[in-house]
């Protein structure tokens, strides 16, 4: 009887892993960002990649020269050189949406969709890796 309870406990613990099993928080790139709305759900602008960029870790997007990039946020302060967005083909293609960061210097903004007038505080989920 005691062994069956121990076995049941082991099975239950292995079936429900802890909160860190699905991903991990990464260091914040910035404390604040500018967006088109409070949720940063509307794109600010559309840009074209001027060069290739290989993501150094899971917070960033790998971008290829010529790809269309939808910009959803622009980091402020120490992270001001990075913007957040999605590459065409990921967000509007068949695959799941993938948002990430990239250096603002590798893109050229071609079309403004909404002004980035909303100052939003970043949180742990902005830099969380799956």
Curated annotation (Swiss-Prot):
Pfam families: SH3_2 (PF07653)
Signal peptide region: 1-22
Gene Ontology CC entries for this record: extracellular region
Keyword Secreted: yes
Tissues in which the protein is found: Cartilage primordia and cartilage.
InterPro entries: MIA, SH3-like_dom_sf, SH3_domain
Keyword annotations: Disulfide bond, Growth factor, Secreted, SH3 domain, Signal
GO BP annotations, alphabetical order: extracellular matrix organization
Start and end residues of each SH3 domain: 42-112
UniProt PTM comment: May contain two intramolecular disulfide bonds.
UniProt-recorded Gene Ontology molecular function terms: growth factor activity
Entry's localization field: Secreted
Main location class: secreted
Intrachain disulfide bonds: 35-40, 58-129
Keyword presence, Disulfide bond: yes
Highest taxon of the lineage: Eukaryota
Induction entry: Repressed by retinoic acid.
Family label: Belongs to the MIA/OTOR family.
Subunit note: Interacts with FASLG.
Functional summary from the UniProt entry: May function during cartilage development and maintenance.
Official protein name in the record: Melanoma-derived growth regulatory protein
Organism (species): Bos taurus (Bovine)
